[in-house]
């Protein structure tokens, strides 16, 4: 059984899933991706794991319509044309095709599956909240194109709810838990650096006047809730002046936020941090905060959990129902409710951070690359 996954863009976190799918299929897994939309680091890792089964397509043409400057979902329309894509699919002669959502390269996979009567799986991440501005024509297209899909692979409850209630696939097979973070390697890197240091020292630091170390990892842009984060932090810091907040990431708001906040009020603007070094930031924090205003399934939360860190997660992150259990491994909050946001920061001062971290590690294990790959592989198997 040959499995072919079409995905023009993805990050490092996907490579372990692809590697596990390749093992489960006894080497009968292929991935087609874009050279223009993936990093050199990702392409190198793919070649190491998959060899010539990693098909990397050269430059593609992208036409953007609408407000291309906005980072919010559905603010613009991007049309992707990749020369040779259909030929690449045809050369593999797959028994199963996996596409990413309805856009980008998905139409090529959908057409091939219909013409050649092959099993079609669709990896779908969006939620009703992220798609609240999708428009009638996007919704109509998705309802029509989705009729060709044999099984949907979703992040969790919110994605399944959107597929069933908003797009009308009420009886379609939908497999949850198909997203994962690169948890194994992050956990390994953090543990390697902490080996010579007793873990209990972290809690002692929080109780000896050094405060709690909060961390944000991600782009410094409007949809990530950066303005709301720093406004709430200003208020929180007046009551807890020993706490610190580190922002690891870059984006269009970075310079503006640096000018406004600098490094005062316990705020540290770290700027860009490579994926291969992000583990050191997880190692040196106590709580990871994700204040997003819209996100399908933020990978930062399971990454933090795999490293044994408590989490503070926005209710607009599509993954929070599965990943965040209030008072168990962290707290959820509404970033648009400033008072609630500030209160969420304060809750960690009466929490057992080490216990929360351990609970988070247990929850995250259900979303490991191995388990995600196994769920996906089982969805492929009905063709046998």
Question: Where are the language model's segments positioned?
Answer:
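Donor nucleotide-sugar binding/catalytic pocket of nucleotide-sugar-dependent glycosyltransferases
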Residues: 147-202, 209
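Short acidic/histidine- and often glycine-rich active-site loop of Leloir-type glycosyltransferases
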Residues: 316-327, 331-332
């Amino acid at each position: 059984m040959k499995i072919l996954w079409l995905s023009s863009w993805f990050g490092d976190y996907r490579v372990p899933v692809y590697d596990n799918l390749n093992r489960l299929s006894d080497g009968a897994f292929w991935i087609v991706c874009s050279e223009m939309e993936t990093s050199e680091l990702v392409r190198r890792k793919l070649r190491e794991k998959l060899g010539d089964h990693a098909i990397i397509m050269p430059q593609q043409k992208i036409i953007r319509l609408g407000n291309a400057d906005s980072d919010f979902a559905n603010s613009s329309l991007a049309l992707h044309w990749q020369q040779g894509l259909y030929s690449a699919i045809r050369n593999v002669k797959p028994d199963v095709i996996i596409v990413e959502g309805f856009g980008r390269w998905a139409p090529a996979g959908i057409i091939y599956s219909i013409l050649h009567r092959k099993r079609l799986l669709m990896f779908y991440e969006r939620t009703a909240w992220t798609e609240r501005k999708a428009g009638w024509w996007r919704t109509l297209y998705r309802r029509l194109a989705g009729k060709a899909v044999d099984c949907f692979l979703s992040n969790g409850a919110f994605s399944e709810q959107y597929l069933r209630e908003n797009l009308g696939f009420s009886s379609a097979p939908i497999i949850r838990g198909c997203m994962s973070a690169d948890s194994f390697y992050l956990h390994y890197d953090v543990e390697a650096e902490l080996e010579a240091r007793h873990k209990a020292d972290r809690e002692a630091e929080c109780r000896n006047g050094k405060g709690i170390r909060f961390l944000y990892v991600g782009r410094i842009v409007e949809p990530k809730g950066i303005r709301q984060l720093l406004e709430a932090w200003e208020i929180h810091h007046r009551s807890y002046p020993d706490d610190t907040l580190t922002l690891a990431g870059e984006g269009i708001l970075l310079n503006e936020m640096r000018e406004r906040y600098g490094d005062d009020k316990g705020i540290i603007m770290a700027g860009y941090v490579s994926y291969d070094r992000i583990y050191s930031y997880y190692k040196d924090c106590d709580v990871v905060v994700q204040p997003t205003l819209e996100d399908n399934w933020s990978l930062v939360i399971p990454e933090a959990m795999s490293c044994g860190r408590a989490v503070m997660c926005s209710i607009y992150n599509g993954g929070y129902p599965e990943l965040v259990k209030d008072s168990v491994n962290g707290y959820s909050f509404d970033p648009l409710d400033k008072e609630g946001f500030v209160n969420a920061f304060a809750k960690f001062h009466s929490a057992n951070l080490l216990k929360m971290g351990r609970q988070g590690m247990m929850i995250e294990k259900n979303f490991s690359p191995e388990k995600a790959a196994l769920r996906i592989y089982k969805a492929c198997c009905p063709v046998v």
